[in-house]
Amino acid sequence: MRGAGTSSDHVTVNAMAEDLQRFVDAQARVIDRVRAELKAGAKQSHWMWFVFPQIKGLGHSETARRYAIASLAEATAYLAHPVLGPRLRECTRLVLATTGKPITDIFAYPDDLKFRSSMTLFAHATNEPVFRQAFEKFYGDVEDLETVTRL
């Protein structure tokens, strides 16, 4: 068992942080639009994969594979990232702030399923309530079983 702070831990953490840069780069081009669409209560453009990522193995397109989260450890690192973590929380809260609409009005199929998968993943990566609140509100408090199986 490796101890905290060993050189191999440091390399792993650094490699994961560098790999997360793919999300930062993708979001940089669209984050203002993402916020506007979520505030309006309807996703209109293509950004789901890198704003609300899912666990590896759920998506089969090249884009889905590129932005898949490989493990619970990577999900935890995503949440701890100084840009990605706050953005994910903010975007999730914007979805939660939408009132009077079912999730299928906010995210058309299959993005409604991707959102559920993402919320399930991050609810397992942290005790923060915001992610669980999302699937409680929109999915009757039922997690995405495909995500849970892969964790």
Question: What name fits each language-model region?
Answer:
Residues 3-5:
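Residue-identity detector for glycine
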Residues 43-50, 87, 111-118, 130-134:
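Residue-level detector of well-ordered alpha-helical segments, enriched
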Residues 77-122:
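Mid-chain, well-packed structural core segment of small domains
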